[in-house]
């Protein structure tokens, strides 16, 4: 890391927040840890957005990650929740060396330009079409950033038909699980994500019910929480579906353990998913994926995944059955092949430090 020394550099991150630990929160903490280890001082402002409802998961995960840091490293990081147009945001931008926005945040770009601050942006969501003033303001904000990193080709294509200078695809990453488990010791299907409409959790339950595999050999583990929790529990109860495990919200360490122990990661959204982080985590430990042809998911699930039509119970059920019927030799080949191309897709975190230093004219 010595060639990416960030000592003395004050980084401000401004990210939208719904109050629950999700993809943006995961990536922010992963990147922040790398920056802290390189000597930077980092402040994270989590901007409350419509629908904000804190459930404690953000604080729990942040505490888990910070617990492994030294006291000196912890002293160079601070985070807090802020309201839109909070004076804290304005003051923090004035004091920083570089502003890293997570998604187009108009006030962040506005103040950065006003005070001639370097402004970089990670764009997580595909561009919506329409004539609403806010949509045009977002386009303006994205165009003004000194660097733009889109999390997938799917997202990038929606914003830039013609690639701009200063833009790149740089997928967000989490702290990837490590250490593979032998294929013969893995069991069942795993879903990780928010239990919200269009993530496919109800379709997955119905598809699993249709094939009714041996619950001992092929359990279905649903990790997460969300507004559909009552619906999920009702579907399981009314249909007497056997083999479904609901651990709820789990720590990062437990999430990694569940990922390694699963035979297949199932990612079935039908919402134009921007990226799909869990397939990357699964592939990093040789766990292949069953995924929909939705948004950026095919990019992260990899060419060796079993793909199904989005929103289609029958198509997903067919893929689940294919996985159940697959012989061990074929599965082992699939597990080995699923890591193919992963290193070409997931770029190292030091890309961010390198860009920060280039913009600050330190290298």
What do these predicted regions represent?
Residues 266, 288-291:
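Short hydrophobic beta-strand element within catalytic cores of glycosyltransferases
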């Amino acid at each position: 890391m010595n060639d990416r020394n960030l000592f003395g550099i004050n980084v401000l991150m401004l990210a939208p927040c719904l109050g629950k630990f999700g993809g943006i929160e995961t990536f922010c903490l992963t990147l922040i840890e790398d920056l802290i280890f390189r000597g930077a001082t980092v402040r994270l402002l989590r901007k409350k957005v419509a629908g904000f409802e804190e459930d404690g998961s953000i604080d729990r995960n942040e505490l888990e990650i910070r617990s492994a840091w030294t006291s000196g490293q912890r002293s160079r990081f601070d985070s807090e929740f802020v309201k839109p147009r909070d004076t804290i945001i304005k003051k923090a931008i004035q004091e920083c060396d570089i502003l890293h926005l997570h998604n187009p945040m108009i006030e962040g770009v506005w103040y950065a330009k006003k005070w001639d601050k370097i402004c970089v942006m990670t764009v997580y969501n595909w561009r919506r079409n329409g004539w609403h003033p806010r949509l045009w303001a977002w386009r303006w904000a994205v165009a003004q950033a000194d660097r733009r990193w889109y999390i997938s080709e799917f997202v990038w294509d929606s914003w830039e038909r013609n690639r701009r200078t200063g833009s790149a695809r740089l997928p967000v990453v989490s702290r990837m699980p490590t250490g593979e488990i032998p294929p013969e010791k893995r069991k069942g299907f795993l879903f990780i994500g928010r239990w919200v409409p269009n993530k496919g959790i109800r379709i997955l339950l119905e598809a699993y019910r249709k094939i009714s595999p041996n619950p001992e050999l092929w359990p279905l583990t649903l990790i997460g929480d969300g507004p559909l929790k009552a619906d999920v529990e009702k579907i399981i109860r009314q249909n007497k579906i056997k083999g479904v495990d609901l651990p709820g919200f789990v720590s990062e360490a437990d999430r990694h353990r569940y990922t390694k122990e699963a035979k297949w990661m199932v990612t079935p959204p039908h919402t134009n998913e921007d990226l799909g982080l869990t397939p990357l985590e699964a592939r990093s430990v040789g766990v292949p994926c069953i995924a929909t042809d939705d948004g950026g998911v095919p990019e992260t699930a990899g060419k060796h995944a079993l793909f199904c039509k989005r929103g289609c119970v029958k198509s997903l059920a067919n893929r689940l059955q294919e996985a159940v019927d697959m012989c061990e030799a074929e599965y082992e080949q699939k597990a080995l092949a699923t890591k193919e191309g992963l290193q070409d897709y997931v770029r190292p975190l030091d890309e961010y430090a390198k860009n920060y230093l280039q913009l600050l004219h330190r290298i």
